[in-house]
């Protein structure tokens, strides 16, 4: 057991190693463990209080970056064993973009977005500036483009089929030179492409818009690049590209939608796009699945649950082909939330079947029509990572309630499925945090309660559980394990009341 002064903002694992990182964002300290969390020590590099952001390289298992609020930062290329400092012309952006963007095949090609500010007598005015490095900041970063909203390598994922000749292409949302000194006007925001790190640039042309402006955002999903544009009539249009050259407008069925107002791109089937669309005119919130081109969509399921921040109560099962779970408002009763599951990439959805027996082996009363097993999903997440985080195909675990609606979290129980959600059984009364280790061979759970002094683990997919006593009672916060789920160890982070702080374990 190790004591920390504050809860971790991040617990990150270096893939294929025993190295774990604990980022205390309150005190600005990064701790490192080389033995899967058994022992910890502050890293040697940044002074205490400097570690503002910790960023793992998504494509290089050995690289990570620590960004401060100033212009001196730190990098490692050996999983945090040693750190080297580097400088940038400006502090990291705090506006919209993420400060670092990584190339998936050239791991030392990195874009950095910084924030340049001027101060006059009345206010501080800031704008974002993009820089690039092709050697992982061993040498100074070079200017890319001034007054940007965001910049990305066009090959945003390994799956995006950018031609070899365009490997160095960068896409930026930015303003025309004529607009660069004026007030930030997002209606004039354009997308620019450059194949020579913005020595030259050209405005991106869309399928039905030769001179598009009003870009709202851009991003990616597996093999697709996506851009959203606000049209002159206030309609939000979605455009899709698979090669960073040709952009085609996404088409949704007009018999369902009259005016698309908000898009949420979801992690979905491998060769399709999953997009939740909110249409203000019809008050429809629905999940749409594309064909293999990513441009022609059909309604998969309506009345999806959307949070105030636009997050959809949906999760795609990464290691189970075609399987996803979504929460929806019950027909005719929006206050009732129910859960649906698909096993065919959204072509059809069904209720989740409730267990026939409770924890004591007694028959449940949920054998009547309309009675199912609604589950808590993303909007009620009380742990790090996926809500159903199994790297073992077929195994799912979640918190829910039996009945015709999802009950409040404190009234829910904990359930498991070992056949990709076709059948479920109760494994604990009350909500529990849980994690999978050893590729599903080890399950660990802890009651989500104000104070616990035990955890439970199972080596037989939840059929039997062994109780493990904790050295002292804690309030559990997070239980996590190595992302690939192969390790036998898991970490439980919790707290106890102290005079000045919480102790974390």
Name each model-derived stretch:
Residues 1-505:
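Extracellular glycan-interacting surfaces
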């Amino acid at each position: 057991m190790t004591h920390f002064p504050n809860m971790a903002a991040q617990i990150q694992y270096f893939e294929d190693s025993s190295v774990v990182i604990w980022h205390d964002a309150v005190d600005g300290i990064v701790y490192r463990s080389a033995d899967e969390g058994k022992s910890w020590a502050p890293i040697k590099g940044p002074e205490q209080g400097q570690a503002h952001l910790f960023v793992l390289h998504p494509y290089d298992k050995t690289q990570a970056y620590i960004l401060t609020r100033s212009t001196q930062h730190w990098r490692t290329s050996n999983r945090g064993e040693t750190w080297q400092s580097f400088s940038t012309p400006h502090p990291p952006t705090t506006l919209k973009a993420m400060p670092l963007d990584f190339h998936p095949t050239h791991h030392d090609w990195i874009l950095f977005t910084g924030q340049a500010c001027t101060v006059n007598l009345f206010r501080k005015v800031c704008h974002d500036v993009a820089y690039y490095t092709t050697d992982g900041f061993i040498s100074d970063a070079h200017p890319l483009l001034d007054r940007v909203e965001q910049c990305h390598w066009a090959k945003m994922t390994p799956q995006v089929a950018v031609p070899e000749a365009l490997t160095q292409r960068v896409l930026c949302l930015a303003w025309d030179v004529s607009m660069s000194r004026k007030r930030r006007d997002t209606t004039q925001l354009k997308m620019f492409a450059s194949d020579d790190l913005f020595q030259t640039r050209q405005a991106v042309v869309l399928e039905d818009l030769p001179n598009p402006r009003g870009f709202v955002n851009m991003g990616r999903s597996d093999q697709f690049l996506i851009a959203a544009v606000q049209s002159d009539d206030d309609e939000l249009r979605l455009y899709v590209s698979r090669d960073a050259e040709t952009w085609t407008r996404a088409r949704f069925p007009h018999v369902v939608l009259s005016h698309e107002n908000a898009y949420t791109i979801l992690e979905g089937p491998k060769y399709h796009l999953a997009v939740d669309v909110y249409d203000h005119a019809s008050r429809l919130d629905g999940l749409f699945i594309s064909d293999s081109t990513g441009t022609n969509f059909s309604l998969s399921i309506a009345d999806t649950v959307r949070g105030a921040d636009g997050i959809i109560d949906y999760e795609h099962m990464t290691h189970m082909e075609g399987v996803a779970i979504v929460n929806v408002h019950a027909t005719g009763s929006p206050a009732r939330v129910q859960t649906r599951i698909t096993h065919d990439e959204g072509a059809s959805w069904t209720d989740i079947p409730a267990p026939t027996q409770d924890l004591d082996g007694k028959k449940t009363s949920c054998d009547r029509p309309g009675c199912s097993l609604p589950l808590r999903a993303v909007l009620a997440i009380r742990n790090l990572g996926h809500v159903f985080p199994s790297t073992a195909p077929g195994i799912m675990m979640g918190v829910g309630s039996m009945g015709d609606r999802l009950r409040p979290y404190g009234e829910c129980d904990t359930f498991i499925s070992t056949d990709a959600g076709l059948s479920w059984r109760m494994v604990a009364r009350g909500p529990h945090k849980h994690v999978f280790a050893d590729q599903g061979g080890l399950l660990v759970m802890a009651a989500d309660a104000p104070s616990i002094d035990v955890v439970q683990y199972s080596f037989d997919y939840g059929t039997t559980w062994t109780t493990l006593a904790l050295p002292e009672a804690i309030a559990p916060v997070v239980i996590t394990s190595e992302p690939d789920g192969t390790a036998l160890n898991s970490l439980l982070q919790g707290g106890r009341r102290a005079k000045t702080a919480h102790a974390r374990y």
